[in-house]
Amino acid sequence: MAGVKLQERAAVVGIGISNMALIRYLVARGVRVTACDRTSAEKLGERAAELARLGVPLVAGEGYLEPLADHDLIFLTPGMPKHLPEIEAARRRGAAISGEIGLVLDLCRAPVIGVTGSAGKTTTTTLIGEILRAAGRETYVGGNIGKPLIEQVEAIPSEAVVVLELSSFQLQLVHRSPHIAVVTNVSPNHLDVHATMEEYVEAKKAIFRRQSPADWLVLNADDPTVRAFAAEARSRVVLFSRRADPGGRDAAFVREDRVIWRRGGRETPILFLDEIRLPGLHNQENVLAAVAACFLAGAPLSAVREVVTQFTGVEHRIEPVRVLDGVKWYNDSKATSPAEAVAALTTLPAPIVLIAGGSDKGIPFDPIAPLVAEKVKTLILMGPTAPKIEEAVRRGGYAGPIRRAADMAEAVALAREAAAPGDTVLLSPACASFDAYRNFEERGRHFKSLVEALS
């Protein structure tokens, strides 16, 4: 399908931050927008008031999808299921269906670097953006992080570069692939929205489906699912690996504790692993992915080294909070899946007091069980997934104490009680936050405020 063309009328479903920016963009260009949201107008508050000021009618609550029946251009919020009957009916009659980030990709004149994966997206995207800025490039970072780019996309010059973090939900709504596409890894995630694991993997493939032979695809050779993507690519493939030389004329890999970049068969040593400030083996993979993307985008070695040797991470990703009475506290609220919790548990030293649990994404928790059994001293569980996590870790051999917390405040209090000097307290929920918070950022900030208040 070609890129979406603006029409006289459009329906926008889901009135979140990015879609409010999209609505402002559309209204400014004379499109008559109908806003749709399952939340009541009262609960939408200021957003409903802004829609009224813009002259945009709002269909809220029950029946919010009814306007889709008479619109030929529909923009969906990324996280909603795409198989709802009203959406399927619109698709069958030929309506154009897209999202805010899909329109950004359609309109953007600058080359785009897109990053997807089940884990590591934000760190890799941020690293790429910082390296390109250090290289002197005018750089815009957005997508699943930062501010919506739709309101400024037409002002981004062709000589700039745009770096997008792209979720599987967003990729279901795009009609163009980035010039440089990066896939960090793929593991079960978002199975509360995607009908099957196969659908989730297919959504990830959209990042390269519409690439040409002039484009690049950067793949994690250590992930069998991701490496297999190479066979389906029309673009040029670059593999990265922290375990071995993955082969090929172009690759990023580790040899004798040193990051190596190979382009056209010529190898360049980049830096030693102990120069990387980011902790954990998973972050070595993120660095390799970022290094490959940035060299393909023309960044010099000096910019790569400058950033990678100084970059210490992003908020809510194994983020040190404080040391209190000999106990180290870490905020890993971004761990919204078991795979991300595994990365944190692998990185930090035992004994660990682990706070986990939240809303259910339909993912099995068995992957965390071996590390919980090996490294966790006390497990504190909260939220609807607590019983499922307890069952999984007991089945996996964890014999330590498990405490239940009604909320984050109680979880922090229980962790303080359980931890001794030399221990690590880790919030790494392995779950989404929507049972108690608007997003993982709000959850992480609440955790940090509670920890900072301890005395």
From Swiss-Prot:
It is found in: Cytoplasm. Its EC number is 6.3.2.9. It catalyses: UDP-N-acetyl-alpha-D-muramoyl-L-alanine + D-glutamate + ATP = UDP-N-acetyl-alpha-D-muramoyl-L-alanyl-D-glutamate + ADP + phosphate + H(+). GO terms for cellular component: cytoplasm. Keywords: ATP-binding, Cell cycle, Cell division, Cell shape, Cell wall biogenesis/degradation, Cytoplasm, Ligase, Nucleotide-binding, Peptidoglycan synthesis. Its main location: cytoplasm. Pathway: Cell wall biogenesis; peptidoglycan biosynthesis. ATP binds at residues 117-123. One of its GO terms (biological process) is peptidoglycan biosynthetic process. One of its GO terms (molecular function) is UDP-N-acetylmuramoylalanine-D-glutamate ligase activity. Belongs to the MurCDEF family. HAMAP family: MurD. Cell wall formation. Catalyzes the addition of glutamate to the nucleotide precursor UDP-N-acetylmuramoyl-L-alanine (UMA). PANTHER family: UDP-N-ACETYLMURAMOYLALANINE--D-GLUTAMATE LIGASE. This is UDP-N-acetylmuramoylalanine--D-glutamate ligase. It comes from Symbiobacterium thermophilum (strain DSM 24528 / JCM 14929 / IAM 14863 / T). The gene is murD.
